[in-house]
UniProtKB/Swiss-Prot annotation:
Keywords: Methyltransferase, S-adenosyl-L-methionine, Transferase, Ubiquinone biosynthesis. PANTHER family: METHYLTRANSFERASE, UBIQUINONE BIOSYNTHESIS O-METHYLTRANSFERASE, MITOCHONDRIAL. Pathway: Cofactor biosynthesis; ubiquinone biosynthesis. O-methyltransferase that catalyzes the 2 O-methylation steps in the ubiquinone biosynthetic pathway. The gene is ubiG. This is Ubiquinone biosynthesis O-methyltransferase. NCBIfam families: UbiG (TIGR01983). Gene3D superfamilies: Vaccinia Virus protein VP39. One of its GO terms (biological process) is methylation. It catalyses: a 3-demethylubiquinol + S-adenosyl-L-methionine = a ubiquinol + S-adenosyl-L-homocysteine + H(+); a 3-(all-trans-polyprenyl)benzene-1,2-diol + S-adenosyl-L-methionine = a 2-methoxy-6-(all-trans-polyprenyl)phenol + S-adenosyl-L-homocysteine + H(+). Its EC number is 2.1.1.222, 2.1.1.64.
Length: 252
């Protein structure tokens, strides 16, 4: 079953040339990108002693906002996206900046089943796919044993609707109107339920919040709007656990 949402693809295809315009439709991603990269690298280093030969997969890579900085840090990155125009934009940027990244136009379903990676990354993608459950199960299938995945998305709360849609799209104009569909936002507990009876452990939940007084973004324990989730594929466990995460236990 495909996770492609054709309406979402059409929406992003119209602006796919503008990924690297810091003042354009993806400007908000540029403003939070240093936090995203720092978080990813922190999780990688906490899981691996030797990071020199790690294989990283970036799913739904867009124009390469995650793949490019990681490649610049010396990581071996494969990045996939369903949109040809996104891959073209990402490839052009990589070539101009001398970055070696294996870009592929592909969905997670089209990736060969035996292709496994030490780190699988999927940021701000889940809320745009057609079948969230199948997408997540396909995603974690490509993690090597004892490897990790880092995903981020938006929580389905009243607070997320207020700040993620009303404020971000209609008041501040951080992202184009109709970028998000509230019904596609995902509660952490729903991801936990999807991963039940798998060998995937949820290691951490971390929120990303905007401090209006300081005009800056920061990591937080507040997961009501944006959140990161770090997963680990265990060798022997057959049941997903929440690793004692209080925010997750509270909403299950």
């Amino acid at each position: 079953m495909s996770s492609i949402n054709k309406k979402e693809l059409e929406k992003f295809e119209k602006i796919s040339h503008n990924w690297w315009n810091k003042n354009g439709e993806f400007g908000i991603l540029h403003r939070i990108n240093h936090i995203r990269i720092e978080y990813i690298i922190e999780k990688i280093k906490s899981n691996y002693n030797d990071i020199s030969k790690l294989q990283i997969l970036d799913v739904g890579c867009g124009g390469g906002l995650i793949a490019a900085p990681l490649a610049l840090q010396g990581f071996n990155v494969t990045a996939i996206d369903a949109l040809k125009s996104n891959v073209e934009t990402a490839t052009i940027y990589a070539q101009k900046n001398g970055l070696k990244i294996n870009y592929l136009q592909a969905t997670i379903e089209e990736l060969e089943n035996d292709k496994l990676y030490d780190v699988v990354i999927c940021l701000e993608v889940i809320e745009h796919v057609a079948n969230i459950q199948q997408f997540i199960l396909n995603l974690v299938q490509h993690i090597k044993p004892n490897g990790i995945a880092i995903i981020s998305t938006m929580n389905r709360t009243k607070k997320a609707y207020l700040f993620g849609i009303i404020v971000a799209e209609y008041i501040l104009g951080w992202v184009p109107k109709n970028t998000h569909d509230y019904s596609k936002f995902v509660k952490p507990s729903e991801i936990y339920e999807i991963l039940t009876d798998t060998n995937i452990e949820i290691k951490e939940l971390k929120g990303l919040v905007f401090n209006l007084a300081k005009n800056e973004w920061k990591l937080s324990n507040d997961i009501d709007v944006n959140y990161f989730m770090c997963l680990e594929k265990k060798m022997n466990s057959l049941s997903s656990t929440c690793n004692g995460i209080p925010q997750l236990k509270r909403v299950i």
